[in-house]
Amino acid sequence: MALETVPKDLRHLRACLLCSLVKTIDQFEYDGCDNCDAYLQMKGNREMVYDCTSSSFDGIVAMMSPDDSWVSKWQRITNFKPGVYAVSVTGRLPQGIVRELKSRGVVYKSRDTAIKT
């Protein structure tokens, strides 16, 4: 796991609404999302960080070896970079972003376990 993907503080943590990666708000703004920045372009854009992440999430798991981990299969994060992930993320991406993802062939499934999609 790369050191820059580990949250540097326990305050101001947010989880990506697309992949559930957990970082501080400053890490998302400075580095973007390690898995989704090609689609969400949060790097250097605090407004996009607020739109595409949530401060409300339940549980965290540290995923180091995606191919060997049953947790990564359970959480649907097998194809993502090693890092710290939320078990459930409250909220949804804005409709405009969901439409853009769909036009690029990316299927968005909410990571909010309270909502069935």
Curated annotation (Swiss-Prot):
Region of interest: Interaction with SUPT5H: 1-40
Record keywords: Activator, Metal-binding, Nucleus, Repressor, Transcription, Transcription regulation, Zinc, Zinc-finger
Gene Ontology terms: cellular component: DSIF complex
Principal location: nucleus
Any GO MF annotation of the entry: zinc ion binding
Cross-referenced InterPro entries: RPABC4/Spt4, Spt4, Spt4/RpoE2_Znf, Spt4_sf
Subcellular location: Nucleus
Heme found in the keyword field: no
Biological processes, Gene Ontology terms: regulation of DNA-templated transcription; transcription elongation by RNA polymerase II; transcription elongation-coupled chromatin remodeling
C4-type zinc finger segments: 16-36
Quaternary structure annotation from Swiss-Prot or TrEMBL: Interacts with SUPT5H to form the DSIF complex. DSIF interacts with RNA polymerase II and with the positive transcription elongation factor b complex (P-TEFb complex), which is composed of CDK9 and cyclin-T.
Similarity comment: family membership: Belongs to the SPT4 family.
Protein function: May function as a component of the DRB sensitivity-inducing factor complex (DSIF complex), which regulates transcription elongation by RNA polymerase II. Probably enhances transcriptional pausing at sites proximal to the promoter, which may in turn facilitate the assembly of an elongation competent RNA polymerase II complex.
Name under which the protein is recorded: Transcription elongation factor SPT4
Species name: Xenopus laevis (African clawed frog)
Name of the gene encoding the protein in the UniProt record: supt4h1
